[in-house]
């Protein structure tokens, strides 16, 4: 019997793979998220590898796996640490978050959980509220005062590109595809 011990913030499962994410909020300048990949085998579920990216994820919809590439969207908070930076996570150091320096990123990782493509620094000062992956497209909604919807083409995993940005009032916490090229935001 084998076990993998640790913390899990989110889980993404499909018929092609199982992924667990764990965000490290320790005293660093920014959060880091570790992703643990598991494969389905004749013996059951087996650990394959892990990777790490900057930031934290909103929920399981911030992750997707197409059978070859794992895609994930994160928000990165720039943090200022004052006091004893060597203290424990709940020790005497003070951490403040600079929302003006907050950015949002989308990463594409290969089967060994290494970053092969990325879009970084979207919507400075905002945070991700919802993400939806549909085929080779990613839809990312961020929020602070307006509600930008980013459309990202993932056709070339090594060179994902922002194809459009729509700014509308409010924000959507859930995106649902209803037809080719149409989304409903709730």
Language model features: what each stretch is:
Residues 1-186:
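Beta-sheet-rich non-transmembrane sensory/scaffold domains
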């Amino acid at each position: 019997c084998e076990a993998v011990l640790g913390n899990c913030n989110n889980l993404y499962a499909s018929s092609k793979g199982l992924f667990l994410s764990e965000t490290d909020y320790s005293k660093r300048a920014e959060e880091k998220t570790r992703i643990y990949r598991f494969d389905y085998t004749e013996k059951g579920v087996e650990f394959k590898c892990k990777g790490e990216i900057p930031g934290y994820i909103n929920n399981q919809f911030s992750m997707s796996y197409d059978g070859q590439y794992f895609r994930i969207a994160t928000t990165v908070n720039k943090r200022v640490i004052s006091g004893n930076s060597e203290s424990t996570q709940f020790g005497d150091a003070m951490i403040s978050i600079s929302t003006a320096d907050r950015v949002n990123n989308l990463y594409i990782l290969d089967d060994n959980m290494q970053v092969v493509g990325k879009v970084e620094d979207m919507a400075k000062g905002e945070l991700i509220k919802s993400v939806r992956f549909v085929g080779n497209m990613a839809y990312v909604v961020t929020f602070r005062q307006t509600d930008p919807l980013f459309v990202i083409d993932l056709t070339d995993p090594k060179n994902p590109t922002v194809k459009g940005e729509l700014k509308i009032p409010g924000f959507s916490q859930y995106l649902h595809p209803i037809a080719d090229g149409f989304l409903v935001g709730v």
